[in-house]
Amino acid sequence: MADQDQNTQQTGSEAPAFNLQRVYLKDLSVEMPNAPHIFLEQEGPAVEVTINVGGQRLAETVFESTVTVTVTTRVNDKVLYLVEGTQAGIFELANIPPEQMDPILGIVCPTMLYPYLRANVADAITRTSLPALHLTEVNFQALYEQRLAEMAQQQEQSADSGIILPPSATRQ
């Protein structure tokens, strides 16, 4: 009976665990370099949005995941505003198979963080007295697959160039 209890406890402690421990706004900046003169422009703005995903290991089973957005809005080639924000989260990932770690950190974690980032960016833009910009949904799976394809292409080009990179140089 005692052996069964120990086996149950071991199995329980070895079960995969995925927990969001904290969500926080790591960085947010708003610049309006051409204010107040830009407010006199009559043309509609052109919006450019770039999104990046990152992360780092903080402890054996604790990771920080980040989603960074840069929004540049221009009117007649003049910057109306530039917003840069990074939303971060601390996640516990224990007993996860190694082949699942990268997809979890590159897809699942950013998907959980992005709604917070969207709200923070919309709020920051509203505080400039301009209409809020509501960022569209992002398919982080497609973004992850695109990143994998780019990395594979870089490795292929490196192999063709005769330059040998250490394995750590090809990982992001």
Curated annotation (Swiss-Prot):
GO biological process, one term: protein tetramerization
The entry's keywords: Chaperone, Cytoplasm, Protein transport, Translocation, Transport
One cellular component (GO) term of this entry: cytoplasm
Keyword Lyase appears in the UniProt entry: no
Domain of life of the source: Bacteria
Places the protein is found: Cytoplasm
GO molecular function terms attached to this record: unfolded protein binding
Keyword DNA repair attributed: no
Family designation: Belongs to the SecB family.
Function: One of the proteins required for the normal export of preproteins out of the cell cytoplasm. It is a molecular chaperone that binds to a subset of precursor proteins, maintaining them in a translocation-competent state. It also specifically binds to its receptor SecA.
Record's subunit section: Homotetramer, a dimer of dimers. One homotetramer interacts with 1 SecA dimer.
Protein name: Protein-export protein SecB
Source organism per UniProt: Bordetella avium (strain 197N)
Name of encoding gene: secB
